[in-house]
Amino acid sequence: MFLGTLYSFKTNTRTVCLLELAKLLDLQVDLVETYPHKFSADLAAKFPLQKLPVFIGADGFELSEVIAIVKYFYEKGKHNDKEGLGPVNEVEEAEMLKWMCFINFDIVTPQNVRPWVGMFRGNIPYEEKPFKESATRAIDSLKIPNELVKDRTYLVGDRFTLADLFFGSLLRIFFNSIIDEKTRKELPHLTRYYITMFHQAKLETYFPLELPLTVTVAKK
């Protein structure tokens, strides 16, 4: 079933989970390479914030905000859900939304990724003090989810769900960059959870599992 078109890029933090979800639900979704604040005039007219990802359905339906897109994809393809990804009742649905909102709005936030992520990728000049201060702030924010997953294999129930697909894929922004070997030892439960979900979500289809020994900043 052709569902529509995603506008983003393949390795975008908030897009990988959508591509894998579409695959798991046998939904055909095209991907048009698009970058934030560099939308075409026509696309910018539809989505003036120019934030990724955005989606336009085959029927012209326009949708932004990643959690809304996850929900829409699942509703369209849940008859093909062979993995038990979705909720079985209202309680599970609420719990899945809770975890997705937590990682999206409380952990992967501008306050927690700027300016270190731009410096790490070489998009802006490296400055030691703001890099270290912002990276430390981000790592501190991960101490809470580290404790929350201490006694959990999965976030909701005893199976891999939408919450794990979403949560695990968003964690990559930290684990492939500022979480070095020393920091992984300080976040043992989150590290174990991330590696497990990386493989369960088949994220190696999109990029390798990267667990750096040390933090290496790209040269601009």
Swiss-Prot record:
The top EC class, named as a word, is transferase
According to its UniProt entry, the protein's GO biological process terms are: cytoplasmic translational elongation
Q: What residue stretch is flagged as signal peptide?
A: none
Matches recorded under InterPro entries: EF-GSTs, Glutathione-S-Trfase_C-like, Glutathione-S-Trfase_C_sf, Glutathione_S-Trfase_N, GST_C, Thioredoxin-like_sf
Q: Which SUPFAM superfamilies did the record assign? A: GST C-terminal domain-like, Thioredoxin-like
Q: Domain (GST C-terminal): give its ranges.
A: 89-216
What Enzyme Commission number(s) appear in the record? 2.5.1.18
List, in alphabetical order, the Gene Ontology terms for molecular function in this entry. Answer: glutathione transferase activity
Q: Where in the cell is it found?
A: Cytoplasm
Q: What is the catalytic activity of this protein?
A: RX + glutathione = an S-substituted glutathione + a halide anion + H(+)
Q: Which residue ranges does the record assign to the GST N-terminal domain?
A: 2-81
GO CC field: cytoplasm; cytosol; nucleus
Alphabetized, the UniProt keywords read: Cytoplasm, Transferase
Q: Which domain of life is it from?
A: Eukaryota
Q: Which family does it belong to?
A: Belongs to the GST superfamily.
Q: What does this protein do?
A: Involved in the oxidative stress response and detoxification.
The protein here is known as Putative glutathione S-transferase C1183.02
Q: Which organism is it from?
A: Schizosaccharomyces pombe (strain 972 / ATCC 24843)
